[in-house]
C-alpha cells in the first residue's frame, strides 16, 4: 500500500528485480483507509515505513494482526523514540536498530 506515485514506481522497479510481474501487487492507496479484511488475506509481506507519527502504530498492528494469514510477515520501521505496544498474537522475528531507526519483523504467533 502506497499513495505516492514516485514511491510506487521505485517499489515496482525493485519488485521486478526480484520477482515476476504477477508475483507482487502494489496497492495505490493509503493502508489506513484500505479494506483490511478483504485485501490482507492474500498478502504475504507488509512493510510499514514513515511517516510514523501520522498514525497510531499500535492500533495499526492490532488491525493488521487480526486480518492477515499466518504466513504473512509484517515489517515495521519506527523511530527509536516511538512507543509501540506489540499485540500478543504477533511474534517478533527480528529487531534491528540503525541510528535513530528501529526495524521490526513480525509474524502471527
Predicted segments with their positions:
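Class I S-adenosyl-L-methionine-dependent methyltransferase catalytic core
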Residues: 1-109
Amino acid at each position: 500500500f502506497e499513495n505516492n506515485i514516485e514511491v510506487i514506481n521505485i517499489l515496482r522497479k525493485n519488485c521486478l528485480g526480484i520477482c515476476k510481474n504477477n508475483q507482487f501487487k502494489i496497492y495505490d492507496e493509503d493502508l489506513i483507509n484500505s479494506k483490511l479484511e478483504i485485501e490482507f488475506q492474500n498478502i504475504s509481506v507488509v512493510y510499514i515505513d514513515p511517516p510514523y507519527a501520522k498514525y497510531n502504530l499500535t492500533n495499526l498492528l492490532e488491525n493488521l494482526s487480526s486480518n492477515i494469514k499466518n504466513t504473512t510477515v509484517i515489517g515495521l520501521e519506527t523511530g527509536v523514540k516511538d512507543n509501540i505496544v506489540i499485540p500478543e498474537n504477533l511474534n517478533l522475528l527480528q529487531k534491528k536498530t540503525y541510528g535513530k531507526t528501529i526495524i521490526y519483523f513480525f509474524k502471527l504467533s
